[in-house]
């Protein structure tokens, strides 16, 4: 049963349909035994073991295509925005991206734009896509637009390779997406 009544103050995490949708729920400490904090030989009752690797939070739900009540970045607005004229250009140390955001609604508003990147397949394990940058428009009047600029470095694209104890970026084609949430 889906229940979606919730007050969301900020947009920092996805809300699963049930807590059991989180892979770490199998490792939640409160599984019937309510021991004492700091008991010798037992994990602290507040301890949760995360075995999902790099796919924690929105990365997990997006990578395995599991539906959520509120996707990462979800938010409400009194107006509507359109995105167009996206440009992505490689730089010597990553890439620069820009997008035009236009208020197509009837009232003034601000839009939080998120930039997601999907890495090339192969090599190290990577989520389906990752948030790499975000920006917020100024207060846009109806019909007004603004161009937002994002700079993403090679370091932002890198993953830690334990076998060589170093940060590495995958070679190949990266896919860049803009949206107000991960589902846009």
Role assignments for model-derived ranges:
Residues 1-5, 9-110, 116-118, 126, ...:
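Secreted, periplasmic, or luminal enzymes acting at the cell surface/secretory milieu
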Residues 114-115, 159:
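Sparse recognition of residues in long alpha-helices and their boundaries
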Residues 123-162:
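Intrinsically disordered, low-complexity Pro/Gly/Ser/Thr-rich segments with frequent PxxP/GP/PP motifs
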Residues 159-171:
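Secreted/periplasmic carbohydrate-active enzymes, especially glycoside hydrolases
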């Amino acid at each position: 049963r889906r229940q979606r009544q919730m007050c969301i103050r900020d947009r920092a995490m996805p809300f699963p349909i049930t807590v059991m949708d989180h892979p770490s729920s199998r490792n939640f400490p409160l599984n019937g035994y309510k021991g004492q904090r700091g008991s010798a030989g037992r994990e602290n009752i507040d301890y949760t073991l995360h075995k999902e690797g790099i796919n924690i939070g929105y990365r997990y739900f997006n990578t395995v295509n599991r539906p959520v009540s509120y996707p990462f970045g979800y938010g409400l607005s009194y107006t509507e925005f359109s995105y167009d004229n996206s440009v992505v250009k490689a730089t010597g140390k990553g890439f620069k991206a820009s997008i035009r955001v236009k208020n197509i609604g009837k009232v003034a508003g601000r839009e939080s734009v998120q930039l997601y990147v999907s890495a090339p397949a192969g090599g190290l394990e990577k989520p389906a896509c990752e948030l790499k940058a975000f920006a917020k428009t100024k207060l846009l009047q109806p019909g007004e637009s603004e161009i937002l600029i994002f700079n993403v470095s090679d370091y932002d694209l890198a993953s830690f390779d334990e076998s060589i104890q170093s940060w590495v970026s995958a070679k190949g084609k990266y896919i860049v997406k803009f949206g107000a949430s991960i589902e846009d």
